[in-house]
C-alpha cells in the first residue's frame, strides 16, 4: 500500500470537496477523480464511445454532463457501462500522477471502486438529511438527489473503507482533518 497517497471519499453531499479544498489550503497536493473523468469525457478520444453509448447526451458533438447525469443515475446498466469505460483510463492517469508526485497526494474519489484497496482511505461522512439539505442548497432537484443517493452504497459500506470523519459542520470537519494531518502526514 502506497502511503504517499490518501483517498478522500464518501457519499454525495458529505463534504469531500470541502475537505479536499481545506487539505490543499494546508499545502498538500490534491486532485479529484471527477475532474480527471470529465477531462477524459471531453477529450476527442472519448467521442466514439460516447456516440455509441450515450448519443442522447451529445449536444453539438460535445457531452452535456447534466444530460449524462440524468441518464446514468436513472439506469444502472448505463452507469456501469460508463464506469467500465472510465475506470481503466482514470486509473492510468492517476498512476502517472502518483509517479510524478514527490510529496503526499490526496485524491478525492466520489466512486472509489477498488482504489480504496490500494491506498489508505479517509471517508468523509454526514447523515443523509444533512447531505440532502446541502445538495438542495446547490440547486439539485429532489428527484436528482434521490436518483444519486439510490445508486450509492449504503452507510455501512462507506464506513468500512477506512478512517471515518463525521462532517457535522465546517469547524468540526476542519478540526478532524487537522488532527488527521498532524498524526499522519507531517
PLM regions and their residue ranges:
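Walker A/P-loop
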Residues: 17
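ATP-binding Walker
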Residues: 14
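ATP-dependent NMP and nucleoside kinases share a basic, alpha-helical "lid"
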Residues: 93-99, 104-138
